[in-house]
A protein has these predicted regions:
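Oxidoreductase and adenylate-handling cofactor-binding alpha/beta cores
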Residues: 177-183
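N-terminal glycine-/serine-/threonine-rich beta1-alpha1-beta2 phosphate-ribose binding loop
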Residues: 2-141, 153-168
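Short strand-turn motif at the edge of the Rossmann-like AdoMet-binding core
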Residues: 73, 146-148, 172-175
Length: 183
């Protein structure tokens, strides 16, 4: 056996393979490394109208769903808007997403955004119908807290807006043991 022949890998080959291995991390998409990938078509970008306790509670529920992104919140109370933005920003950082959450005093401005897919309506009860109708007319999916409306006319107007807008509108309904029929 020749003296200059060595077993194993040469330093030059080791450095070349190491550089190739490290370069592969810049080529691979991040989802292939961490195992999580949500297609853009599977993401739902939410906007919240009404940032009181119910809106924050609903955010907590929605935040546990994969593919949910929160883009904006709206409330007439500036303190609630600021609290919401802080909470969303902290959640986005925890998720490894660049923090960005816009806040609005007037919901009509938020409804003009094309990047928002769905709206959560958690306003005081007497605003549910109007905000839901406007959100449907803006082409947004809507999740509305109960009660949906105070009058049959409001309810019918909401249905018409949902059908005309071609988007689903859902609402909260609690289920308890007393709601069950039979066993």
């Amino acid at each position: 056996m020749k003296e200059n022949e060595k077993k194993g890998i040469s330093r030059r080959k080791f450095l070349g393979l190491s550089a190739l291995g490290l370069a592969s991390f810049t080529i691979l998409p991040s989802w292939s490394i961490n195992g999580v990938r949500i297609a853009p078509s599977d993401r739902v970008v939410l906007g919240f109208i009404g940032l009181g306790q119910q809106g924050l509670s609903d955010f907590t529920s929605f935040s546990n769903c994969p593919g949910v992104q929160v883009a904006a919140g709206c409330d007439v109370d500036s303190m609630k808007r600021e609290r919401f933005v802080r909470r969303i920003t902290a959640w986005q950082k925890q998720q490894g997403v660049a923090p960005r959450c816009d806040s609005y005093e007037f919901y009509e401005e938020m409804l003009e955004r094309k990047d928002i897919d769905a709206i959560e309506v958690a306003t005081p009860d007497h605003w549910h119908a109007l905000t839901t109708i406007h959100a449907c007319q803006a082409g947004k999916d809507v999740y509305c807290q109960k009660p949906l409306a105070y009058t049959i006319a409001e309810g019918l107007a909401m249905v018409k807006a949902g059908v005309t807008g071609g988007k689903p509108a859902t609402f909260e309904r609690r289920v308890s043991e007393s709601d069950r029929v039979g066993s």
